[in-house]
């Protein structure tokens, strides 16, 4: 019994060595991030992407984290998205890119897995692959992604339902701060919003990325929008 405190301390130390927490945003400026300067800034202690009807992006562009690629990880952050009127009634779409690659560096365009969110009632929480295979899991679905003859059109096997889409939507606060969590371990991907699991995916395809960059999306749209991010915490295995 006398050895138990030592064993417990050893286990705690081992766990600490295995996992590393890293704050990705200092709350003050864009240090560690790069994007099209005219669209990104820090406002009210948050990374802020903004377009207006008179000043739009020509295609989806991203604020890209500059400290290398990430493989297995847990990422949590808070986000807020509003339409051109500062509400959540018209257009507003964004997402968190992970295990992605830069495909157009001059305009900070990436492709890859995306944890989607929006002002609307449908897409927040889904798994989307930007400039790739499109929607891989709708909100509330457990999915296994299988190979097919066309790598861009994989076979999506829905193996279960986590929750109804409308019940997940009811937990999202419009035009306010929400918490997003992404867990990626091997080919197993999970998204959470405000503690609610929204998708659970196993990607068994060869093209499923195992590592890549992190980035935040500013979406092209018919009208302006503002998206903000803060409290960005990355946990990885050392």
How would you name each of these model-derived features?
Residues 19-238:
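Carbohydrate-interacting regions of secretory-pathway proteins
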Residues 5-14:
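Bacterial N-terminal signal peptides
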């Amino acid at each position: 019994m006398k050895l138990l405190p030592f064993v417990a301390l050893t286990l705690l130390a081992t766990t600490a060595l295995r996992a590393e927490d890293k704050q990705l945003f200092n709350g003050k400026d864009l240090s560690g991030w790069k994007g099209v300067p005219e669209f990104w800034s820090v406002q009210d202690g948050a990374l802020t992407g903004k377009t207006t009807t008179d000043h739009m992006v020509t295609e989806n562009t991203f604020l890209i984290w500059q400290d290398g690629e990430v493989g297995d990880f847990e990422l949590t952050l808070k986000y807020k998205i509003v339409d051109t009127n500062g509400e959540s009634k018209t257009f507003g779409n964004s997402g968190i890119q992970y295990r992605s690659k830069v495909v157009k560096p001059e305009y900070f365009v990436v492709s890859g897995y995306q944890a989607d969110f929006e002002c609307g009632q449908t897409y927040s929480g889904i798994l989307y692959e930007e400039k790739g295979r499109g929607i891989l899991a709708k909100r509330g679905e457990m999915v296994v992604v299988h190979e097919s003859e066309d790598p861009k059109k994989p076979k999506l096997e829905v193996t279960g339902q986590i929750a109804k889409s409308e019940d997940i939507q009811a937990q999202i606060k419009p035009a306010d701060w929400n918490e997003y969590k992404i867990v990626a371990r091997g080919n197993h991907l999970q998204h959470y919003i405000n503690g609610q699991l929204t998708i659970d995916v196993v990607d068994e395809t060869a093209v499923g990325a195992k590592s890549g960059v992190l980035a935040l999306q500013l979406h092209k749209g018919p009208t302006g929008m503002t998206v903000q991010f803060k409290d960005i915490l990355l946990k990885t295995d050392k």
